[in-house]
Amino acid sequence: MHSENKLSNHGKQVTSGAQSQLPNVNQAQQQAPAGIQGSKGSVSGNHGVKANQISPGNPGLKSLNQTGGGGGMMKTKAKRERSVSIDTGDQRESLTPVLEPDAKVEGVMRSKRRCVLERKQPYSGDEWCSGAETEEEDEKPLSATHREHVMCPSQGHSGSSTTGHVSDPGGPGLGSGHGPGIRTDLHSRPPQQVVYVFTTSLANSAAEAVMHGHTDSILLYHQQNVPRTKLDQSTGVGKVSNLAEHISSSHSPPIGTPKSQSGTPRPASVGGVGHLPGTSTPSSTGHPDSEPAQTHRGGGTSSNNGRSAVHTLGLGNSGPQSVGVSGTEGVDRPGAIPHHGAGVSPSTSPSVLSALRQSELGQRVGPGNTDGLSKEQLEHRERSLQTLRDIERLLLRSGTGVAQEDPRGPNGNPNGTNVNNNNSNDGGRGLEDGEIGGGIPGNCHINNAGMPGMPPVGGMKKYEEPLQSIISQTQNLGGPGLDDSLMGPHHGMPPHSHHLSSPSGLDMGPLLGPEGVTPEQLAWRKLQEEYYQEKRRQHDMNPHQHPQHFRIMPEMGMPGGPPMLMRGPPPPYHSKPGDQQWGPGPMVGGGMGGNARMMDMNQEGPRGPRFLGQMRGPSGGGGYPESPGGVLGVEGLGPQRPPRPGMGWLEEIPPNMGGGGPFHGCCPPGGPGGPPQHFQGDLDRPMTREEIYRRIHRLDLQQMSRQQQQAGLGGPRMMDNPGGPGFPNPGMAGGPPSRGDPMDFPVSRTIMGSPIGGVGGDGGPTMRDIVDSPLGGNLNMNMGMNINQQQQLLAQKLRGGPGVLGEMLNAEDISRIRASQNGRGGANKAMIPGPEGPLQFPNQSSFPGGQVDGPYLQQPGPDMYGPDQPGPPHLSSTSRLSHIPMNTGSRVTDLGARHPPDLPISVNPMGSPAIPPSHQLKSPSLSQEPSPLMPSPSAAGLKSPSQLPQSGPTHPPLPAASGAGTPSSTSIKSPQVMGPSLGLRSPSGSPGHLKSPSMPVASPGWTASPKAAMPSPGGPPSVKVTGNGGSSSTDTGMSLPPRSSNSTPISQPSNSINPSMPFTSSPDAPPSQNPLSLIMSQMSKYAMPSSTPLYHDAIKTIATSDDEMLPDRPLQPGTNMSVGGMGNHQSAQMLLSSQGAMGPHSGPQSPMGMVLQGGPPLSHDHPGPMLPSPNPMGIPGMPSEIMGGGGGPPDGIGPCNVSPMHTQNQMGGFPRIQGPLHSPIGGMGQQFPPRPDDVLPPQQMHLLSKGMSHQRPPHQPDSFPPMPMGDGPDLSEVIRPTHRGIPEFDLSRIIPADKPSSTLQYFPKSETMSQPQQNPHQGQPPPQVSSAQLLKQLSSSGPPHSNIPSSNPHIANLQNMMAEQQLPLHPSHCGMRPGMGMPQIGSRGMGSGGGMGPMCHPGHMMGRTGMSPQQQLQQQHHHQQQQAMMANNLLQHPSHPPRGMLSPQQHPHNLIAQQNLMMMQAKQRGMALPGEHFGQQGALMSPQGPMMGPPHSQTGMMGPQSLRQRSMSLDSPLGYGPGSMANMPF
């Protein structure tokens, strides 16, 4: 390789002219201090080579080339050097001293010097850009120089790296160290094929030889000692070599050639020294062909250059490297240069862009030099870039990219090389050689990732390389990458250009550049983005999310800036999901609306080509991998990293980046992206960001409403979400990502989850599957995230714009996408079909029409719409959105997290809620329902709604999927998310599916709650994110954590909602339902993972609990019912919605979910009834199943899933519960009751177990009943109905339960109780009364328990509601019971589902869900929790003891959890995700409890409370198993 590289370098020698500047400087210095310099060179070369492998590879190559480039090269070099010298004389001189000192301090010194060098290099690079541009040759040399620069720095680092590259880190060492370290090790070692990859030993040998003066340069040493075979291995190198030779041959000609190369030289340089320079060399030409790939990655691979090329490409190997490396490296390293981000020297940007562009675009001509720009032009470019860089530095907080960048190097490098890669690329860091570690590491990372991942960077298929690299990145990104990406890219963001380069950056970066936006424009845009982002972020209070959020946003959005947003994020999302989703989506969806824009954007120029091409092509096609990989890689963050994560996101992603609420979703673009994208679609990119933020915010609301209205159908919106979403949902709205784990990708989860779930089915499941499944969690996540985002975007876009399109698109697209995704996610697939409508039969069944769109849509329409439709809900959503954004942001972040973990995604989902909330919010916002739904379930909810359709589709498929099992699971998970998420959606999907419509809405609504709750939990969920499962839906934690931030806002909203609690009441009911469902589902889900028996028991318990929840249910029903029962449920939904709207923050928040739930449940109910009982049972059950099943699998999928599941469940369940409760309160309620009552249903559910998690819960109650239900004194004992019908708690009774011991004691009792409860559920008015009493007690005890005051009001409401409900329910018994039961179930479901976390970690999930409220309600929650506990107790008889109540279910755990939860809650509130692990759960639980319990309880959240509690309960039961998890925290 080295030889080859040398050859390349040799050839490059000419290039070396430019190289010579740096390299020459090095060389000159090396020459001067030949020995030393040689050593230096050697070291440089050696290490450089290694580093080179990193990115420095190029520089190393160059260095080596120049130095080692060989004797002959030396001559040329000398010539070149002189030439370059002239050009670079000053640089060289500058460098020379540096070099010389470096030479002196050969190892580390050199490294340090190199740092300086690099710093100077920046100058050099810039100069070089100007100087080397003497000829294209120069340009090439530029490349070479860059390489050398990179190399030099790298070499220094490398040398140091090899030698003391870690120590070298002193300067460049850092980046280099990392880069080289990693690169050296990773790249150097693994990819010896590519750049002169010096094995450590080889490099060391070379270094020694050089040091000893045996050889002039490492390159020479290698040339002499390394078999050409190796060199040849690097085709790129060989080509480069040829090219180099060509160039060498034509030092001057390179000018001409460079001209050609100009178009390619950079790439050539970059790609392979000469590979790009098609003209220069055939090989160049070949490379150019591969360049895009090769250069991009292959190029990097192709030779050191390849690395550099990649770097160069990525980082702007040639120019950028020089510039970037030089400038950025130096600067970046220092961190001054904003990383070259924009800076990477123009080169980076250009180079990267160029490289990337060349890669992607096929070499848009090196950015600068490659452009064949004149020196002045190059200089100008450099200056512009520098300015941009400065701006970035200043503006982008990350501007300092270096810190980020370097860290990136270190972080990135370590992190996932890819990240660095991305980052490097992204951050331009790649460019930073010194940052070689940092910057180049990025590239290196890319290479590394590629190399390590695809060791043969060179070996890597040049063509595949980029893709793989990206994929690698994505994957790497997926995890760390995601985060890194998020973070790094976040950092990278600063470099936006790069950032673009970064995960998305790669694509994005180039895109940006290629975008045709001038650096200034870019900078401005960035600034704008930044500003808005910042604003948004602050606005969102997504501090947590910020980075990710920001990251994603930047990554997604920022990078593209607004355009990038579209372009960037969407593309990534696009790529990932899009490509899956967007692919079609964008492609198709591109037409979608926003998507189109996105697509367009993507398409647009570089991005288009790049993303689209890449993304589109690969993404679209293979896109998935590519998408995730490429785009994702790009996205990296993924949103799904990871989401992201991604995102993001998420993200997942992250992705919150969207910063703005919308963005937040995992996909900032998604959510925000969605809207933003949507907006973007609407707005132009530039505006997009800002507008997006602003608009998104406003729009979110507005759009939510508008969209909602626009969706008018809600359907569209929903559809959008659901439909479009269907696709979007799946993709965007579906948020397959969202729904999917990518939901996990936070957003993803729900969003992903939702979408994924829904479409998510498509993406969701896919995502989920992917993510969750493992489809690549990363990918998935990323995808999810992306998808999520995309989904969101799509959804939003669809929603916003294309509602129809969405629908249309959705169905088809979704289908397609789903298929695509599904392809990935079986569930998805099923879903897809479902989404199509069919699959979702459950949903469909409920809404056949709307399955996807139908149910989803329908749901959305009705439900989704309903709530959504209502402006308020919309608003709600929007509100939620707003906070959700926070959440979302968080979520997105979570997304990022989520992606990575389902959890995050999950979290995201719930968190998603956060993210989804973000997404949900975002999307939901966008979607409105989505917002609410989405938001609510957002992840799940929104998504749910979105998901619903997806969910519906998914859900139904879920069932199928459920059947589908994993997919199902995933699907379910997704669906689950779908379910729960979907649940919401699920309702749509699940119940509706069941509630589907409603639910979705409800979900959203409820989700809102969850969402809000989530958001709140978001925060906690965010924490939850950790919670993961909990997260999922609620999760949210992932998102939440950031969400937490968001949460805060969300929390507020939550709190608001809390206040809204009354609404909550209503919502509560729905939540109840939902919760029940959720919980059930969750339970199923949860249990599933746990032990089935446990699960069953848990579910049963939950079911029982649900029964206990009757009050809640009644409450719910009452409220909901009041609202209109089932029909109401739309009404209610509306109500809820209103509430949701009203309380998106308020009502919705706590109620958020509740309210929304209520509404949604209404919706759900709507469907529920529609779904009707049977469905409810079936659907609800199904949803349950879905939820449950989904949950189960999701659970399996993990807590994450749970989250989504939970979300779904929550959403679904909750809504379900609510729906049923609501709907039938008679219907559903009955249903539920029947279910619960029926236990059969529960059993059935049980059967459905998975599917019927919901039922199962009831069933479980059967099974488990004793546990919670039997909590200590009978509910009746504990709770005495008052004349008012408000249950009073016998605190003496309850409190004991509070104690873990008591709880434990009660645990058995609980069982007893449970049964009674169930009976009550079935026909135990007393217990119901008990419930009432409980409620009362709750009230009563609530205060005692906790700050009932806070709680109290709600509780009072709750009580009233409860009383009402109770009465109604009571009378309804069926209803009430169901209410209770359902609520219970809901509780459980919610708790479980809602808690999803519960399922997952009911606690966290729920917490997620609940958390939000919890957080919001946190205090309340505390009391509420306690109350909830009480309520739960009430609700859940098991909860008799307040905590005991929970406890019973969770019994000790629950109790403890609850207590802990409370504690946690507080913490969580703090966002601690307490329970962190399950703190989340705990938190979740807490939230669950509180949210569920108290908030719900209080508010009527009883349902939710129940849910929450149930969640807790669920947790408890699940806690035992999963419950343990749940309990775990405790």
Curated annotation (Swiss-Prot):
It comes from the Eukaryota. Residues 81-93 have a biased composition (Basic and acidic residues). Residues 1258-1268 have a biased composition (Pro residues). Keywords: Activator, Developmental protein, Nucleus, Transcription, Transcription regulation. Residues 19-34, 156-165, 409-426, 485-503, 960-971, 979-994, 1031-1060 have a biased composition (Low complexity). Pfam families: BCL9. One of its GO terms (molecular function) is beta-catenin binding. Residues 1-101, 155-187, 246-353, 398-439, 473-503, 821-1076, 1250-1279, 1310-1331 are annotated as: Disordered. It is found in: Nucleus. The keyword Transcription applies. GO terms for biological process: canonical Wnt signaling pathway; lateral mesoderm development; negative regulation of transforming growth factor beta receptor signaling pathway; positive regulation of transcription by RNA polymerase II; post-anal tail morphogenesis. One of its GO terms (cellular component) is beta-catenin-TCF complex. Disruption phenotype: Severe defects of trunk and tail development. InterPro entries: Bcl-9/Bcl-9l (IPR015668), BCL9_beta-catenin-bd_dom (IPR024670), Znf_RING/FYVE/PHD (IPR013083). Belongs to the BCL9 family. PANTHER family: B-CELL CLL_LYMPHOMA 9-LIKE PROTEIN (PTHR15185:SF3), BCL9 (PTHR15185). This is B-cell CLL/lymphoma 9-like protein. It comes from Danio rerio (Zebrafish). The lineage of its organism: Eukaryota, Metazoa, Chordata, Craniata, Vertebrata. The gene is bcl9l.
